[in-house]
Regions:
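Gram-negative outer-membrane beta-barrel transporters
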Residues: 246-251, 338, 342-346, 366-454
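Periplasmic-side early beta-strands and strand-to-turn transitions of outer-membrane beta-barrels
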Residues: 24-126
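C-terminal beta-signal and adjacent terminal beta-strands/loops
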Residues: 40-46, 447-456, 475-513
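Outer-membrane beta-barrel transmembrane domain signature of Gram-negative proteins
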Residues: 126-128, 152, 168-254, 421, ...
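Membrane-embedded beta-barrel scaffold of Gram-negative outer-membrane proteins
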Residues: 34-36, 40-42, 143-161, 278-280, ...
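Flexible loop and strand-edge segments within Gram-negative outer membrane beta-barrel domains
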Residues: 73-79, 93-146, 152-182
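Structural signature of Gram-negative outer-membrane beta-barrels, strongest in the C-terminal barrel
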Residues: 197-201, 205-209, 224-345, 431-433
Length: 513
């Protein structure tokens, strides 16, 4: 039958969201159409701690100082998403699918708090148009599952920087970076279950990339537009095989092998091994462990992006190990699940984009070795009372160390032995939800410790993003009538009105709805 769902959202800072979902389901055919349209001025107020103002008396003597309240500048956006899916199932059980997704986005890139320009003097925008179309086929018979997909993706990305120092509306283009990316792809996969103890799977995928990217605003010595485009194509092929074996109900073992070809180069065979064992059926206590080789080759942007690409980059390679414990407790109308995992990863030639003082731009480099290790813990609980109340809780905590173990690039390089930039050492999140009849109350909380913004881990004014926590609260009520179902939902973001930045010099909104 036919289905219709429409959601209208209205929020702070002239934010409007509209979502429409149309569905149809028949004996053989089914269809799904989704449309999402979002707009916002995104001009929230914040206190600018990078711009100190001084108060003077009639004699010009400084008698006070303060940090001014300002509005977020050039941060508005408009996004349109359209997705169409069509499915057909034959009498023999084959399932064919067609899907297309389109994105049309226009976003202003908000000015940094340290930027002294006005909106009339500087405009930063990014426009993106992306089309992705995929055709697929699936079949499941006698324990054998087969599938194939093929498609095409096109992206047109434009970054535009315009400036008018006098603020008279006569903008001059400083940067007009354009990227057009074409990708053809195909994938075939198979999965076969041999009894209850064995499961075999394999897939092969290929991609053909074609990229044209550069700055169209550059003028050469002859007064004509310079050709800064990089034109690159690359063929990529990957093959993957896996086997899972459960010799006894308590023990499970799995092994993976992966191999890839990119351009005229190939990766080594990349193995991975997984195991899990039920220590105790009482409490469902399970211990898990894995070991995997890592290998990541540079992307076309890493190699050739202008300006900044590095054609001499080496691929990342290394090993990752992890081990953990999980338990699940269930009772009448309640359950509890907890897990803890420790991991250790050592990567050679880690690819990292950094600012180059010599070139004045960001460029990717290889760090000889990065050692990443830590612990992750998760907890979820659920309970239901005789009065119809339902309580749900999900939480997680992580301790992560990502240390540069490479060699210094110069005598002044203080990054060796330090935490990588923008990776918090501690982080945590919690979601609590209460449901009763058609009411739902949800509280979300997350926290991040300080993050370094300089590879030396200097704690100066511009050397870190301060720790912060966030609280969101929402209340939803469902309503039913003979011909439709409705819901009303109210949300409060940043409930405790926290002042914070997620990226240096880019403040985030305080309390808003």
């Amino acid at each position: 039958g036919l289905g219709l769902r429409y959601v209208q959202g209205i929020g702070s800072f002239a934010t409007f969201d509209e979502f429409l979902h149309l569905t149809y389901g028949g004996a053989r055919w089914s269809s799904s159409t989704r449309v999402l349209y979002s707009t916002s001025d995104n001009d929230f107020r914040f206190r600018n701690y990078n711009s100190k103002e001084f108060v003077t008396d009639d004699d010009g003597q400084i008698v006070g100082e303060y940090y001014p309240l300002q509005r977020n500048r050039n941060g508005g956006f408009r996004d349109l998403h359209v997705m169409q899916e069509l499915y057909y199932t034959t009498r023999g059980g084959d399932r064919f699918s067609l899907a297309a997704w389109y994105l049309d986005s226009h976003r202003g890139l908000a000015m940094l708090t340290s930027d002294r320009n006005k909106s009339k003097q500087k405009q930063n925008t990014q426009d993106e148009r992306t089309l992705r179309a995929v055709a697929g086929w699936e079949r499941l018979r006698n324990g054998l599952k087969l599938g194939a997909r093929a498609g095409y993706t096109y992206t047109d990305l434009r970054y535009l920087l315009k400036q008018d120092p006098e603020g008279k509306g006569q903008f001059v283009v400083n940067t007009d970076a354009r990227s057009r990316i074409h990708t053809l792809f195909a994938k075939a996969e198979a999965e076969y279950a041999l009894g209850e103890k064995w499961l075999f799977s394999a897939n092969a995928a290929l991609h053909q990339h074609r990229v044209r990217s550069g700055d169209l605003s550059v003028i050469g010595n002859n007064g004509l537009r310079a050709d800064t485009l990089y034109r690159q194509e690359r063929f990529e092929l990957s093959a993957f095989a896996a086997v899972k074996w459960r010799p006894v109900p308590r023990l499970g073992v799995a092994a993976d092998l992966r191999w890839e070809l990119y351009g005229d180069r190939t990766t080594p065979v990349i193995p991975a091994l997984f195991a899990d064992y039920v220590l105790s059926k009482r409490g469902s206590v399970v211990v898990r462990a894995s070991a995997a080789r890592n290998y990541r080759y540079p992307t076309l942007n890493d190699l050739y992006f202008r300006p900044g690409g590095n054609k001499n980059l080496k691929p990342e390679r290394g090993w990752t190990f992890d081990a953990g414990l999980e338990t699940t407790l269930k009772g009448d109308a309640r359950s509890l699940r907890a897990s803890a995992t420790a991991f250790d990863s050592r990567i050679d030639d880690w690819i990292l984009w950094i600012g180059s003082p010599k070139l004045g731009i960001d460029t990717p480099i290889n760090i000889r070795r990065v050692h990443s290790y830590g612990v992750e813990a998760k907890l979820s609980a659920e309970a239901e009372t005789s009065g119809g109340w339902r309580l749900l809780l999900d939480g997680n905590f992580a301790w992560t160390r990502s240390i540069n173990r490479g060699d210094p690039f110069s005598p002044a390089d203080e990054s060796v032995g330090k935490q990588l930039v923008y990776i918090p050492v501690y982080s945590a999140a919690l979601t609590a939800r209460v449901e009763w009849r058609r009411w739902e109350l949800t509280y979300k909380w997350n926290w991040y410790s300080e993050r370094y913004t300089m590879s030396s881990n200097d704690l100066g004014v511009l050397g870190r993003v301060k720790p912060y926590f966030m609280s969101d609260l929402s209340l939803e009520k469902g309503l039913d009538c003979k011909w439709a179902s409705f819901s009303l939902k109210g949300c409060i973001h940043n409930l405790l009105n926290e002042e914070y930045e997620s990226v240096l010099s880019r403040p985030m909104p305080r309390l808003n709805v």
